[in-house]
UniProtKB/Swiss-Prot annotation:
PANTHER family: SPERMATOGENESIS-ASSOCIATED SERINE-RICH PROTEIN 2, SPERMATOGENESIS-ASSOCIATED SERINE-RICH PROTEIN 2-RELATED. InterPro entries: SPATS2-like. Keywords: Coiled coil, Repeat. Residues 22-60, 250-321, 388-1081 are annotated as: Disordered. Contains about 100 repeats of the sequence DGENNQ or DGGENNQ. The lineage of its organism: Eukaryota, Amoebozoa, Evosea, Eumycetozoa, Dictyostelia. Residues 267-283 have a biased composition (Pro residues). Residues 22-53, 411-421 have a biased composition (Basic and acidic residues). This is Uncharacterized protein DDB_G0290685. It comes from Dictyostelium discoideum. Transmembrane segments: none annotated. Residues 284-313, 396-410, 422-568, 576-602, 614-623, 633-644, 662-672, 680-733, 855-869, 877-888, 955-975, 983-1026, 1034-1081 have a biased composition (Low complexity). Residues 18-131, 173-242 form a coiled coil. Residues 748-768, 778-832, 840-854, 889-954 have a biased composition (Acidic residues).
């Protein structure tokens, strides 16, 4: 009989199927580990690609402008040739990255099957727990007793095979025992010839001299003990050999369970030797103790006095049989209990207790092996004589359920490894105190969101660091949300939900932006939330149907974040999501990383190596993380959608290919976005800040509010990974399939969302938990109707991106003192900010958002928005609104005034990132970022949507059915240059997003658009004229300057650029808002 035959016979035939499934799962897990490594290797390659793309992007911008400004056909031809070559290299890199996305989809699919297998396995085990015979051993008839006797014999056989397998199927190694016997024999001779070994010394000499007979008595007693010990060791060798021969494995079994035939012998499981009887003598003996680890001896009795020891003898680094066959904790010792062997540990441990108690630790061969309690059962039915009870107790107490550390303990273990692979990290997983917690979650074993950091081991979601001390993405107190709000405070949400875009599109991707082609931040039906869950995925994602990234009271909360209760379906909900395999998007105190987050180590709204998490953590504020104290991405919903999240049914906040990240970047994106190596909201070294993203000390967030007074989706997805941001390698905030949700899982991936391959922002069972529960059943990112929808998140009618801040009243994307993206700059490098290497959003000669020849706010390919547009759709802009956008009242969604500040930023009624009549894109009536009637980032009625759909409309959010947060292809200006707006500043004192000292706003204001001190209208200007600057807020200026901003003859609106290019927004020949309404080609 093979081990499988024995197992099947002893338990139930259907278990064989479960065992096979578990074996398959094991293979899948190993395969996935390899794939994780491969993916990390690809990340390194992608980082190299990203650096190359930065250069290529700048080249493309330069050549494109040169083609446009060429004075002769020959000159034009030369530059066109250079431009074609550059585009070809960019395409090669993009193709390579798109392969990663399809690979990710495959992994997601595989993980679904894995989950299915686990569920099936649990089903197979149900009959054991429901069997009355097991529950009521006293009410059994004679036939049942006979049947149970046989069953015990079979179980005994299972144990025998199990032990042999535990030793790799190899014969016992007697080297230690033989060595011990030799030493004992030598000792015997010494004692015999020289007397009792401890009879020396002055006291001994006197003693021996006075009482000669004592010496002889001691010697004889010791000789007798030595002989006994020699015999016991010899018996042990004999028993071990006999046992091995009885339960020998076949070659195939040996291959499967550890050692191949011919392999060196595995280290044998140490065997216990009984403690020798103490010698009655006052003289201490030193020879009666042994150093071998106890192991059950193979006696034929049913009880034993040896203490079982858990030891792993698997020297091949292969899973032990226990894990292979059924799981357990993976420790060989666990496996030594048939229950666990067959059923996978905790799942069946109840049954063991029901059969007879005990946690299933193996006391010894025989009846007790099944669990101490089985002895009680056996006695009750007459199988075992009651006289053996004392020994039984002595042996088995230690296996008692309560005493066992919950290793197989009923309740505690039930979802401790609810699925060994996911759940926010093997050890912490939504633990009450650490989940996303003190030590790892949000940053487990492999990183999640960043190869090396994301939720680093010690802080991510750690109790004390959340959003580094220097803050980052939010400042000391808020980070991506800030202490009180972040990512969806009660009043705003999706604050900078997607600002920060990718190479091609900004916060969305080439084809969609924060929403995808069809919607944005919500999708046609669900907006930033989806019909049922948003930012949660089909079932829950980032919260799931019932909870998601937050919940009314805790979100990513203090104690359970990412986990206290962990429900299978709420992901990023009550217990997980926003956590990922290793977790992410969480952590009590750190969130959004120690030094960079929303930017990564050196750059890009995410950082070279990490993602939405910064070196050590990720997306999560002290109290609420990725959600805000009360709601998270909206009280009731959250970035996501039934299928997509933060976007259309198919894409949202990412789009099939990108969104909130885009295929290649966005919100960090591979090449830039809010922090490309050389430009875009950051630059390699400063990204959104001098040194790290959104400012030296804080990041896209500011001390108190991060992206808004209270938060603003903090930088909900700025925050991104190399390719994806807030998500995984390939999907930001989700990736192709999950970005901030993605088609299937939103903010995390189908199964893990904002979290990792297996568990989304927290793991299957725990999600961005929150103090009380994260992702309350009724609100978390999931209400059917509001999700990022009617009532809030990314587009509430009254607040979204909220009433009080969203990139808001005081700063947005910046601390009060540090403002927007960094102490020195934000949204840009010291020299370039929000864009070009040297200028970005504000250099006198070269700024973005308006330079005569060259601006950025996106750059040709990225511009805070994407290749084709950003900062506004053709027909309905974003980032603007007559009164605020990103503003005092809301942004990204207020009925009458949205996004971009009281005066509005990046979109005042009269100017908005451009002149009333010409900005961005040069079209008089039609530009982005500024047309009175028609731009994104600023239309009176539509801004980031339309009254009905803005990033939050009941039906589509994010703008228009087809474009979202701006143009079909972009967005980004808005949220990106919302970037301030606030009544008091946005835009650090030193400002950012602008000149060396001011960035997008002038010394005192910065991309603040509308600040009391004006911003953008500064003497030093920024992003625009000498006197004005991307201020988008001065009543009449912004881009209205002599040199103009976002609308000059030669710029913005570069061929491939934003704000007016052939393909873009802001009014080009093909996109004319009036004609296309943001449905750019």
């Amino acid at each position: 009989m093979t081990i499988f035959d024995a197992v099947a016979k002893a338990i139930v035939p259907s278990v064989t199927h479960a065992i096979e499934e578990n074996n398959k799962n094991r293979e899948i897990q190993e395969k996935r580990q390899k794939e994780t490594k491969d993916r990390n290797d690809r990340m390194v390659q992608n980082q190299k690609d990203r650096k190359e793309m930065i250069g290529l992007t700048n080249e493309k911008q330069t050549y494109s402008n040169s083609v446009k400004n060429a004075k002769t056909d020959n000159e034009k031809k030369i530059f066109q040739n250079l431009l074609d070559k550059t585009n070809s290299r960019i395409t090669d890199i993009e193709k390579r990255q798109s392969g990663d996305i399809s690979e990710y989809k495959r992994l997601v699919e595989e993980n679904k099957n894995l989950e299915k297998n686990v569920k099936e396995f649990k089903e197979v085990m149900k009959p054991f727990e429901e069997n009355d015979i097991i529950h009521n051993p006293k009410h059994v008839d004679e036939d049942t007793i006979e049947e149970n006797k046989k069953k015990m014999e079979d179980i005994k056989e299972v144990l025998g095979f199990t032990k042999t397998a535990a030793n790799g199927g190899l014969p016992p190694n007697h080297d230690e025992d033989n060595k011990k016997i030799a030493e004992l024999k030598k000792k015997y001779d010494d004692v015999k010839n020289h007397g009792h070994s401890n009879s020396g010394g002055l006291v001994g000499s006197v003693f021996n001299a006075i009482v000669p007979s004592v010496k002889e008595n001691l010697r004889n007693a010791e000789l007798e003990n030595i002989q006994k010990e020699i015999k016991q060791t010899e018996d042990k060798i004999s028993n071990d050999d006999k046992f091995y021969n009885t339960y020998k494995l076949t070659d195939d079994e040996r291959k499967q369970f550890g050692s191949n035939p011919g392999d060196p012998q595995a280290t044998p499981t140490p065997t216990p030797t009984p403690t020798p009887t103490p010698t009655p003598t006052p003289t201490p003996t030193t020879t009666t103790t042994t150093t071998t680890t106890p192991k059950p001896t193979t006696t034929t009795t049913t009880t034993s006095t040896t203490t079982p020891t858990k030891t792993s003898t698997n020297t091949n680094d292969k899973p032990g049989i226990f894990e292979t066959v059924g799981g357990g904790s993976g420790k060989v010792a666990d496996a030594l209990n048939p229950i666990r062997i067959v059923t996978g540990g905790a799942i069946f441990s109840d049954t063991m207790e029901k059969i007879g108690g005990g946690s299933g630790k193996l006391a010894d061969e025989g009846v007790e092996a099944v669990g101490s309690g089985i002895s009680n059962f056996a006695q009750s039915v007459g199988i075992i004589p009651k006289k053996q009870e004392p020994k039984k107790d002595e042996n088995n107490n230690q296996s008692n359920n309560n005493n066992n550390n919950n290793q197989a303990g009923d309740d505690q273990n039930k979802n401790q490894n609810r699925d060994e692979n996911n759940q926010g990290g093997e050890n912490n997983q939504g633990g009450e105190n650490n989940q996303d917690g003190e030590n790892n979650q949000n940053g487990d074993e492999n990183n999640q969101g960043g190869e090396n950091n994301q939720g680093d081991e010690n802080n991510q979601g750690g109790e004390n660091n959340q959003g580094d001390q220097n803050n980052q993405d939010g400042g000391e107190n808020n980070q991506d949300g800030g202490e009180n709000n972040q990512d969806g405070h009660g009043n705003n949400q999706d604050g900078e939900n997607n600002q920060d875009g990718g190479e091609n599109n900004q916060d969305s991707g080439e084809n969609n932006q924060d929403g995808g082609e069809n919607n944005q931040d919500g999708g046609e039906n669900n907006q930033d939330g989806g019909e049922n869950n948003q930012d949660g995925g089909e079932n829950n994602q980032d919260g799931g149907e019932n909870n998601q990234d937050g919940g009314e009271n805790n979100q990513d909360g203090e104690n359970n974040q990412d986990g206290e209760n962990n429900q299978e379906n709420n992901r990023d909900g009550e217990n997980n999501q926003d956590g990922g395999e290793n977790n992410q998007d969480g952590g009590e105190n750190n969130q959004d990383g120690e030094n960079n987050q929303d930017g990564g180590e050196n750059n890009q709204d995410d950082g070279e190596n990490k993602q939405d998490g910064g070196e050590n953590n990720q997306d999560g504020g002290e109290n609420n993380q990725d959600d805000g104290e009360n709601n998270q991405d909206g009280e009731n919903n959250q970035d996501g959608g039934e299928n997509n999240q933060d976007g259309d049914e198919n894409n949202q906040d990412s789009g099939e290919n990108n969104q909130d990240s885009g295929e290649n970047n966005q919100d960090g994106g591979e090449n830039n976005q809010d922090g490309d190596e050389n430009n875009q909201d950051g630059g390699e070294n400063n990204q959104d800040g001098e040194n790290n993203q959104n400012g030296e000390n804080n990041q896209d967030g500011g001390e108190n509010n991060q992206d808004g007074e209270n938060n603003q989706d903090g930088e909900n997805n700025q925050d991104g990974g190399e390719n994806n941001q807030d998500g995984g390698e390939n999907n930001q905030d989700g990736g192709e399939d999950n970005q901030d949700g993605g088609e299937n899982n939103q903010e995390g991936g189908e199964d893990n969302q904002d979290g990792g391959e297996d568990n989304q922002d927290g793991g299957e069972d725990n999600q961005d938990g929150g103090e009380n529960n994260q992702g309350d059943e009724n609100n978390q990112d999931v209400d059917e109707n509001n999700q990022d929808g009617e009532n809030n998140q990314d587009g509430d009618e009254n607040n979204q991106d909220g009433e009080n801040n969203q990139d808001g009243e005081n700063n947005q994307d910046g601390d009060e003192n540090n403002n927007q993206d960094g102490e020195q700059n934000q949204d840009g490098d010291e020299n370039n900010q929000d864009g070009g290497e040297n200028n970005q959003d504000g250099d006198e000669n070269n700024n973005q958002d308006g330079d005569e020849n060259n601006n950025q706010d996106g750059g040709e390919n990225n511009q805070d928005g994407g290749e084709n547009n950003q900062d506004g759709d053709e027909n309905n802009n974003q980032d603007g609104g007559e009164n605020n956008q990103d503003g005092e009242n809301n942004q990204d969604g207020d009925e009458n005034n949205n996004q971009d500040g009281e005066q509005n930023q990046d979109g005042d009624e009269n100017n908005q990132e451009g002149d009333e009549n010409n900005n961005q894109g040069d079209d008089e009536n039609n530009n982005q970022d500024g047309d009175e009637n028609n731009n994104q980032d600023g239309d009176e009625n539509n801004q980031d949507g339309d009254e009905n759909n803005q990033d939050g409309d009941e039906n589509n959010q994010g703008n228009d059915e087809n474009n979202q947060d701006g143009d079909q292809n972009n967005q980004g200006g808005d949220e990106n240059n919302q970037d301030g707006d606030g009544e008091n500043n946005q835009g650090d004192e030193n400002n950012q997003d602008g000149g060396e000292n001011n960035q997008d706003g002038g010394e005192n204001n910065q991309d603040q658009d509308g600040s009391e001190n004006n911003q953008g209208n500064n003497e030093n200007n920024q992003g625009g004229d000498e006197n004005n600057q991307d201020q988008d807020g001065g009543e009449n200026n912004q881009g209205n300057d002599e040199n103009n901003q976002g609308g000059d003859e030669n710029n913005q609106g570069n061929e491939n650029d934003q704000g007016g290019d052939e393909n873009n927004q802001g009014g080009d020949e093909n996109t004319n808002q009036e004609e296309n309404g943001g449905n750019d080609e």
